[in-house]
Amino acid sequence: MQYTRTVEALKQGTVIDHIPAGEGVKILRLFKLTETGERVTVGLNLVSRHMGSKDLIKVENVALTEEQANELALFAPKATVNVIDNFEVVKKHKLTLPDAVEGIFSCPNSNCISHNEPVKSVFYVKTLAHDTKMKCKYCEKVFSRDIVAEVR
């Protein structure tokens, strides 16, 4: 069987691979990856031997930090985030859930002061029995990850 690349190689930037199918567009939107001004290559529902199907994102000339990569773990805990330089992987981020996430999500509680005050949203992240919960720093209400992500 002949092996062919579905997506072109990246000279410099970041590759986010092994994203669960259907989560790629959400990650693009939440992390504003299309607002970098750089070329973004997106593969949706690509064939994967390990996952069945997956999404893939490549962002040229942008190197995600460890903190940014860990924030991705909220949506794709088994994703791989590789920083590329001159077509070579120079850094592999090992994803772990962050303790807190700042400025990415809006609080689902319409009475939360974060909607009316000039403050960045902050959520504390906890995993309980395979369910990720997020607690707002300001109103102290606890929400599931899916509810918080939908509000943004």
Swiss-Prot record:
The keyword Cell membrane does not apply. GO terms for cellular component: aspartate carbamoyltransferase complex. It comes from the Bacteria. One of its GO terms (molecular function) is metal ion binding. Pfam families: PyrI (PF01948), PyrI_C (PF02748). Binds 1 zinc ion per subunit. Its cofactor is Zn(2+). Gene3D superfamilies: Aspartate carbamoyltransferase regulatory subunit, C-terminal domain (2.30.30.20), Aspartate carbamoyltransferase regulatory subunit, N-terminal domain (3.30.70.140). GO terms for biological process: 'de novo' pyrimidine nucleobase biosynthetic process; pyrimidine nucleotide biosynthetic process. Keywords: Metal-binding, Pyrimidine biosynthesis, Zinc. InterPro entries: Asp_carbamoyltransf_reg_N, Asp_carbamoylTrfase_reg, Asp_carbamoyltrfase_reg_C, Asp_carbatrfase_reg_C_sf, Asp_carbatrfase_reg_N_sf. Disulfide bonds: none annotated. Zn(2+) binds at residues 107, 112, 136, 139. Contains catalytic and regulatory chains. Belongs to the PyrI family. Involved in allosteric regulation of aspartate carbamoyltransferase. This is Aspartate carbamoyltransferase regulatory chain. The gene is pyrI.
